[in-house]
Swiss-Prot record:
It comes from Sphingopyxis alaskensis (strain DSM 13593 / LMG 18877 / RB2256) (Sphingomonas alaskensis). This is Ribosomal RNA small subunit methyltransferase A. Keywords: Cytoplasm, Methyltransferase, RNA-binding, rRNA processing, S-adenosyl-L-methionine, Transferase. Specifically dimethylates two adjacent adenosines (A1518 and A1519) in the loop of a conserved hairpin near the 3'-end of 16S rRNA in the 30S particle. May play a critical role in biogenesis of 30S subunits. The keyword Plastid does not apply. Belongs to the class I-like SAM-binding methyltransferase superfamily. rRNA adenine N(6)-methyltransferase family. RsmA subfamily. It catalyses: adenosine(1518)/adenosine(1519) in 16S rRNA + 4 S-adenosyl-L-methionine = N(6)-dimethyladenosine(1518)/N(6)-dimethyladenosine(1519) in 16S rRNA + 4 S-adenosyl-L-homocysteine + 4 H(+). Its EC number is 2.1.1.182. SMART domains: rADc. The lineage of its organism: Bacteria, Pseudomonadati, Pseudomonadota, Alphaproteobacteria, Sphingomonadales. S-adenosyl-L-methionine binds at residues 22, 24, 49, 70, 96, 116. One of its GO terms (molecular function) is 16S rRNA (adenine(1518)-N(6)/adenine(1519)-N(6))-dimethyltransferase activity. GO terms for cellular component: cytosol. It is found in: Cytoplasm.
């Protein structure tokens, strides 16, 4: 196939600011990203927002079976050409990733999620993938591109300025790491900020915890992060009393409460 940059030029395609698009053309960089999940030969990979298909090409070169969801109709002809070049490996679905059921699309098989997430929906998709009631999930790993600031919030330790709701939701039942930083100059057009690849793999879930309760607790707690817990959590019935019973001082602020403490509080409220 011709180089991706040439294919994009021939089709007269440009990145859409409205869709949060920034294209990657560096094949070596894309191959490095596709290698982060490990051996994908024969594996199923779900990709969000492939755009013109740069990362898709790299994933297909690993031997993976890729299911790609793209809402930008301008990109569909390029992806159709890619499907012809890799027969039987690529399925393209024209839809909004927020509207699809990944487990249903993958036929119940385990899968990896690899995506250069559009900046405008990345966090919403990420938290959705972290909140299924059943655990471990069907996904085996998440390899996701975020703005560096968001990536740092996902892996942040307790007590740091970056630590917040994203860190708790990511770390309470998954292992999270920054696998790679990507300079803004690697993109076309260059975004205003640096990016990073975050990789997550499922860990054992602490027993007796309802993810919906944990989600609500952290939403309240970190929604007013400068307030003491006795103020930020007072809208949740029994939360302050449960915190005191667990030895969590209600005069503390949310950013000082560890992942394990948030989990213990969610468990107590779920009884």
């Amino acid at each position: 196939m011709p180089p991706l940059r040439e294919t994009v030029r021939v089709h007269g395609l440009s990145a859409s600011k409205a869709l949060g698009q920034n294209f990657l053309f560096d094949e070596q960089l894309l191959d490095r990203i596709a290698a982060i999940p490990g051996d994908l030969d024969g594996a199923t990979v779900f990709e969000v927002g492939p755009g013109p298909g740069g990362l898709t090409r790299a994933l297909l070169r690993t031997g993976a079976r890729v299911i790609a969801v793209e809402r930008d109709e301008r990109c569909l002809p390029l992806l159709a050409d890619l499907a012809e070049a890799f027969p039987g490996q690529l399925t393209v679905i024209a839809d909004d990733a927020m509207a699809v059921d990944v487990d249903a699309l993958t036929g119940g098989d385990p899968y990896h999620i690899v995506a250069n997430l559009p900046y405008n929906v990345g966090t919403a998709l990420f938290t959705r993938w972290l909140e299924p009631a059943a655990w471990p999930p069907r996904w085996l790993s998440l390899t996701l591109m975020f703005q560096l600031e968001v990536a740092e919030r996902i892996v942040a330790p307790v007590g740091t300025s970056a630590y917040g709701r994203l860190a708790v939701l990511a770390q309470w039942r998954a292992r999270a790491r920054i696998a790679m930083k990507v300079h803004r100059s690697a993109f076309t057009p260059p975004p205003k900020v640096m990016s990073a690849i975050v990789q997550l793999t499922p860990a054992d879930q602490p027993p007796g915890v309802d993810p919906r309760i944990l989600s609500r607790l952290t939403e309240k707690g970190f929604g007013q992060r400068r307030k003491m817990l006795r103020q930020s959590l007072k809208g949740i019935d029994g939360a302050v009393a449960a915190a005191e019973a667990l030895g969590i001082d209600p005069t503390r602020r949310a950013e000082t409460v560890s992942v394990a403490e948030w989990v213990a509080l969610a468990r107590a409220l779920g009884r």
